[in-house]
Amino acid sequence: MITAITHSNLIKKHWNWHSNIRFNNFSDFIIEIPKHGFTHCDAPAHMIKNGKSLTECKLDKLCGWASLIDVSECLGDKPINDELLEKKGKNILEGDIIVLRSNLNDNYPNSSEDYWKFSPFLDDSGSKWLVEKKPKAIVFDFPQDRAAKDLQFRIVKNHEFTEHQIILGADIMHVEHAIKLNLIKNERFYLFSLPINLPNADGGNCTPISIFGLKEKDYKIVDHSSVMDNNDIFKSYLTLSFNNGDQ
């Protein structure tokens, strides 16, 4: 039997991620959300000059075999280093999607400031260890850069996001702020992360789904979504913190 679990969080009022929902003249509503807020993916262009955009990254980089590493012992603003990952990550294979599970959201809801305050973070040694494993992508259920804790107090510059610099700089995509990773009981499983189809974007909101019961690679990845390329509905902004942004 094949079962699936969705790992995207709800879009609702948030102290750090501005969102707005309003109705138009039809039986519909318009949603305004940051593409790097809530559950989303990062393409290398998010932080890396001349890095690949979401359009240039093949969808199968976000789909395939995944391996789970439990890093919950690092809750409470503790670093995730290479020594811990070496001990916990024995099941990692080249080309996997690596899923780092801290269970942060189970202890501190991501709508609270404590979610950032008590999040673990990857230090440089941990980030480099992940790159050495040559994964397709990495999934996080926590804000993985130490510098992210300062976002509510000051403008954090691009170079301070060292985990982003190391991992996106190695052409490895992120899936950030996943939830319900505690429901995953297997060390290896299939994971599909389905991003919104934004033209030449440095990332976008996505829905990661873990699937259990598939025995082999018996699938083909085809994107059937239309591109949001109308300037009336898609606008990009260059921020002071993320100074590469969209192309």
Regions found by a protein language model. Name each.
Residues 1-247:
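Active-/binding-site microenvironments in catalytic and ligand-binding cores
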